[in-house]
Amino acid sequence: AIIQKRLLAHFGQGQVHHEPALLELIHAVPDWMALPELSTPQIKHSLEQAILAGTAPARLNTLKALIFNDLAFNFYNQVENAKIALSSQGATVLSLTERGLDLWELYTRLQFEQDIQAHARQIEQVVLDTVAASGLEPAQIDAVVKTGGSSSIPAFSEMLGRLFDPRKVIASNPFSSVTAGLAIRARQGASI
C-alpha cells in the first residue's frame, strides 16, 4: 500500500499520461519480483527516449535508476523498515539516495492506516468468518495469538482488541512465530 499510495509519484505516476508502455513500467514498481526483469535494453531505450522528449524527465530518471542501478532490494527494504517503524512511532521518513535515486518521503502512521484501510476491513472479515466457522462466539475464544509482521501494526491490534477480550490477545515474536508454528505442524506430520 505504501508504494501504490505514496511512492509511485516519485517514478512518474500522475505526470506520465497516454503512454501505456511507461505507465506499465511505473505500475510494476510495487511488484518486487517483476522489477529486476524490466532491466532490458529495450526498456532502457524507451525510458531514455521519453526522458529526451521531456516526459517527466526527473521522475523517469528516478525510475530508470531504480530499475537499472540494482536498487530494488534497497528500495523494498526502506519500505519494509517504514512499516516496522510506524508500528512504534507516529511518523517515519523513507529515504534512499544512491546511484541516481533520490527519494525522500515523510510518512505518518495516520497516512499508513488510511492506505491500508481496505486491507484491514478484509482481514477483519476473515477473522470474523473464521470465528463463525469454528462455531464459537468471540467470548469463547481462550487466546488470540498475534503473529507475522503485520500483527505489530497498531490498527490490527486495536481491531483484535475490539473483536475479542483484549486480555486474551497475546503478542508473539512476529517474525519467528510463523516458522515455529510450521515446524510444530511438520513434526506432527500434518500436511501444510
Predicted regions and their residues:
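Residue-level signature of catalytic and energy-coupling elements of molecular machines
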Residues: 2, 79, 127, 146, ...
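Short glycine-rich phosphate-binding loop at a beta-alpha junction
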Residues: 17-28, 131-148
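Generic beta-strand/beta-sheet core signal
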Residues: 97, 144-149, 172, 183
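Glycine-rich phosphate-binding loops at beta-strand->alpha-helix junctions
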Residues: 67, 71-72, 138-160
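Conserved phosphate-binding/catalytic loops in two-lobed NTP-binding clefts
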Residues: 139, 157-184, 191-192
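Phosphate-binding glycine-rich/basic clefts of nucleotide- and phosphate-handling proteins
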Residues: 1-98
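Phosphate/ATP-binding catalytic cores across multiple sugar-kinase/actin-like superfamilies
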Residues: 82-85, 115-140, 144, 185-188
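Adenine-nucleotide phosphate-binding core of ATP-dependent small-molecule kinases
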Residues: 64-72, 101-130
